[in-house]
Regions:
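Acidic (Asp/Glu)-rich catalytic clusters
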Residues: 347-352, 459
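Bacterial N-terminal signal peptides
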Residues: 37-45
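Non-cysteine beta-strand/loop elements that form the S-adenosyl-L-methionine
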Residues: 356-369, 463-473
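Bacterial N-terminal signal peptides that target proteins for export
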Residues: 20, 24-36
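Divalent metal-binding segments
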Residues: 54-61, 66, 70-344, 359, ...
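Sec/Tat signal peptide C-region and signal peptidase I cleavage site
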Residues: 49-52
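His/Asp/Glu-enriched, well-ordered alpha-helical/loop segment
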Residues: 403-413, 420-442, 452, 456, ...
Length: 611
């Protein structure tokens, strides 16, 4: 083909290079040089195109591709070169790059999407919990609870006196802690430490032997300041009843053994495989410097703990980290600028780990809304106590910490469930935005209650809502542990996703796994229907499919600070994509939530296959 084109150009040039009367020899020479340059340039272009085609290792064609790229939302085909996307377009355009060495993947009209991103997932902590005795948030009767825990303990081979931990306990168990005490403070449990970790990861129940290890007794409770008294539940006589909230949980978990490298690697492998099976090729881990044996809610400012971060390094060293991980470091409520410098030393330890970034910090502004914890900070009051919940740091302290982090170029991700915590978080971001326009995609996560006056502030301040919309359903949590204790307006206004979107906010999708399932298809279903086992929750706040697909692709990637390489299918981005088993744009909502990922690719390589 190249030779035919050159022959045509040569014949054309000979006609033009004939002497022209009146113009002399110089014009003939000019034509010769011009045609020579055209031939050279054309030959180089064809050679370059040929070389590029030779290196296109895979072409996907005959498909339907949702790109999450606003400039080219849909396509038929995609070419992959060296693990990156070389081109996206029609079958005709992309198949032009085919050579004898190119692998062709006929999509047979199936849908392809970017690899999904989860903007808030405790992936390693969740895996450690899954690999341990786990109640899976199930509400069970006391006989079943006792039977399961006794069975797990016998299977564990735990030595006497070694703390035994059961994960995934439904917080409804804490409603009457004396019932737990009657079972697990007698017989073997009188000397055997037991910790039931709440499925919300904010609450727990410890038996007497476990409280003894932590030094929590009557005297300890009596010496707590008024600000701290809410972290430990007490009986009518003022003795600890075993219920622990936020920093109270830390008092016990710091006495748990830290997982060794073998366990961290096993948990990491579990987490990566599970996420890849759901089509997830990236996530933001919001507490990478915390884990068993380390404090989370009451971290000391000088802490240099690395938490579960080594798990990601171990995976990467084995070539098994087939996901982008943006790992955040939890900052102490007492943190200042100096503490951010110390956190930087932790970041530097993992600076060269492939597929791992540490873009910033996570701040806990408050706790959770559910009874009996009720530690989420409200503008109003809880009906039963008349209290407003707790801010974990002062308004001024939050402003200073956010401002200092923004100045250092750190992404800031704030946990805020109550409307007072959300408002004060926005106030803090407003200070930083007024001082400088860093452009960093800061975010607030959870957002169970938001003052309607604050809806427009997210867009105005360029703050992303990172929402776990699997929670936007009517279930026992809302009916039994929330509804009786807050006013009707607040109850029906929970998780105001559509209101935030209508006011210009860009929503990112997240799971908060293991607090709820990591399955993004179920979460998107809940966001689109707001249906739950016990009815619907304010269906005016439903979101559409396109919004949710963007929330779990390019918007989540932006929230995690990885949108330069992931989150959409566009030229130059890493080739992270999935193939699904059904037409997600046409099936019913019930069918959508059962979507299965047939294949997941990371950097152009197949990392998961259903079959």
């Amino acid at each position: 083909m190249v030779f035919i084109v050159l022959a045509v150009i040569t014949r054309w040039s000979l006609a033009w290079m004939s002497p022209v009367p009146g113009n002399g020899r110089w014009l003939s020479m000019l034509y010769r040089k011009l045609i020579f340059l055209i031939i050279i340039a054309f030959s180089a272009s064809l050679s370059t195109r040929s070389a590029i085609a030779e290196s296109i290792e895979r072409i996907l064609f005959n498909g339907r591709i949702f790109t999450a790229n606003s400039e080219q939302p849909f396509a038929q085909a995609m070419a992959i070169k060296d693990g990156y996307i070389f081109a996206v377009g029609s079958d005709e355009e992309i198949l032009a790059y085919k050579t004898a060495n190119t692998e062709l993947l006929d999509l047979q009209n199936k849908w392809v999407l970017p690899g999904l991103i989860d903007a808030h997932s405790h992936a390693i902590i969740g895996a450690l919990a899954e690999l341990s005795p786990n109640l899976q948030d199930e509400v069970v009767d006391l006989a079943t609870l006792k039977q399961r825990i006794e069975g797990w303990f016998k299977q564990s081979g735990h030595g006497s006196g070694q703390p035994f931990v059961v994960f995934g306990a439904n917080p409804a168990l804490w409603s009457d802690p004396q019932i737990l005490a009657d079972i697990f403070n007698k017989n073997r449990w009188k000397t055997q430490p037991l910790l039931l970790m709440g499925s919300d990861l904010h609450t727990a129940w410890a038996n007497g032997a476990m409280l003894n290890i932590a030094g929590i007794d009557d005297a300890y409770v009596q010496n707590l300041s008024d600000h701290q008294r809410h972290i430990i539940g007490v009986t009518s006589k003022g003795s600890p009843d075993g219920v622990l909230i936020d920093a109270g949980v830390d008092l016990v978990t710091v006495h748990l053994p830290k997982p060794d490298d073998e366990m961290l690697l096993k948990a990491g492998q579990y987490a990566v495989h599970m996420n890849n099976s759901y089509g997830i090729t990236g996530w933001m881990d919001p507490a990478a410097n915390a884990g068993p044996g380390e404090a989370l809610f009451s971290r000391k400012p000088a802490s240099l703990g690395t938490g579960i971060s080594p798990a990601y390094k171990l995976l990467a060293e084995k070539g098994q980290l087939t996901a982008h991980v943006a790992a955040l470091l939890v900052a102490s409520p007492l943190s200042d600028v100096a503490d951010l410098e110390r956190l930087d030393t932790v970041r530097q330890q993992f600076a060269a780990v492939p597929n791992l970034t540490m873009p910033g910090i996570k701040i806990f502004a408050d706790g959770v809304l559910e009874f009996p914890a009720q530690s989420a900070a409200l503008l109003g009051h809880y009906k039963n106590s008349g209290k407003q919940g707790e801010m974990l740091l002062t308004a001024e302290g939050l402003k200073n910490l956010v401002d200092a982090a923004d100045e250092k170029g750190m992404l800031v991700h704030i946990h805020a469930l109550g409307d007072r915590a959300v408002k004060q978080s926005l106030d803090a971001f407003e200070v930083a935005r007024k001082k400088r326009n860093s452009g960093i995609a800061h975010s607030i996560t959870h957002l169970q209650l938001v003052d309607p006056n604050d809806y427009p502030r997210f867009a105005a301040l360029n703050i992303m809502p990172v929402m776990q919309l699997h929670w936007a359903e009517m279930d026992n949590y809302l009916l039994d542990l929330v509804k009786p204790f807050i006013n009707e307006t607040d109850f029906w206004g929970q998780y105001p996703a559509r209101s935030l979107q209508k006011n210009g906010a860009v929503i990112a999708g997240a799971s908060d796994w293991p607090i709820s399932t990591a399955n993004p298809w179920e979460a998107m279903h809940h966001a689109m229907t707001r249906d739950g086992p016990d009815g619907g929750l304010n269906k005016a706040e439903r979101l559409d499919l396109n919004t949710m697909l963007l929330a779990y692709t390019i918007h989540a990637a932006k929230a995690a600070g990885i949108d330069d390489k992931a989150g959409s299918l566009a030229k130059g981005k890493q080739a992270d994509f999935i193939i699904v088993d059904r037409d997600i744009f046409k099936v019913s909502h019930d069918s959508f939530k059962n979507t299965k990922v047939l294949q997941t690719y990371f950097a152009g390589n197949l990392v998961y296959s259903l079959n």
